[in-house]
Amino acid sequence: MASPAMHPVLSAAVPRHIAIIMDGNGRWAQRRRRPRVIGHRAGARAVNRTIDFCLEKGVSALTLFAFSSENWGRPQDEVDALMKLFLHALDREVEELQRRGVQVRFIGDRSRFAAPLRDRMAGAERSTAANSRLVLSIAASYGGRQDIASAARALAEDVAAGRLQPEQIDEALLSSRVALADLPAPDLFIRTGGDTRISNFLLWQLAYTELWFTETLWPEFDAGVLQQALDDYAGRERRFGLTSAQIADKATESSSA
């Protein structure tokens, strides 16, 4: 069963949901002969610029890939610095996000984070839960395969408990168990830093998402670059497996209804 988010449409000027891999912090710092953590701090400022842009344009959901399940394998000093930066950012930014009407969520496996950080994450979610201007989802210790496996495990547990029959499992049911299930699927995916892959990010959710890649390093990402992405997106035709003629016919039917 197709979800409403998968009806063929011409791209709107402003996507409802933008997902971003924020790549290039380390290279930005290295080019300046600075420690990598300096790049991550500069990247935090780019996050604020992106939130500002989304609020101004009326984007309803923004999902940021902050820390992958594979990133735990990075050098320990970098992981430790990232955890401190993450903790300080939560302490510093949540009150401002609350004031601006931003709802904060986290997706991913929290069990590997230290207790103080888990507590801050839960506190940020509680304090902003009623906000509705923008849903900011932060993927932390997240992996797309892990996400799908967790959803499959939950369905298997329901079958084993007799709450569900195997023949009832379809794409829509699995979609309801993965992360971000209550949000529209991302309309636009952006990756900064020059690499052209999705790196285990939202594998299920990105099935029909428009992909946009830029050489811009994340700390240099600003409203101008984001507007370029939106301009490109607005010129695309989202067919969801159909033909352009079918989309034109559906548009005619909708306008005459």
Swiss-Prot record:
Mg(2+) binds at residues 23, 210. Homodimer. Binds 2 magnesium ions per subunit. Belongs to the UPP synthase family. Its cofactor is Mg(2+). Pfam families: Prenyltransf. The active site is at residues 23, 71. NCBIfam families: uppS. This is Ditrans,polycis-undecaprenyl-diphosphate synthase ((2E,6E)-farnesyl-diphosphate specific). GO terms for biological process: cell wall organization; peptidoglycan biosynthetic process; polyprenol biosynthetic process; regulation of cell shape. HAMAP family: ISPT (MF_01139). Substrate binds at residues 24-28, 36, 40, 68-70, 72, 74, 191, 197-199. It comes from Xanthomonas axonopodis pv. citri (strain 306). Catalyzes the sequential condensation of isopentenyl diphosphate (IPP) with (2E,6E)-farnesyl diphosphate (E,E-FPP) to yield (2Z,6Z,10Z,14Z,18Z,22Z,26Z,30Z,34E,38E)-undecaprenyl diphosphate (di-trans,octa-cis-UPP). UPP is the precursor of glycosyl carrier lipid in the biosynthesis of bacterial cell wall polysaccharide components such as peptidoglycan and lipopolysaccharide. Keywords: Cell shape, Cell wall biogenesis/degradation, Magnesium, Metal-binding, Peptidoglycan synthesis, Transferase. Gene3D superfamilies: Decaprenyl diphosphate synthase-like. PROSITE patterns: UPP_SYNTHASE. One of its GO terms (molecular function) is magnesium ion binding. InterPro entries: UPP_synth-like, UPP_synth-like_CS, UPP_synth-like_sf. Its EC number is 2.5.1.31. It catalyses: 8 isopentenyl diphosphate + (2E,6E)-farnesyl diphosphate = di-trans,octa-cis-undecaprenyl diphosphate + 8 diphosphate.
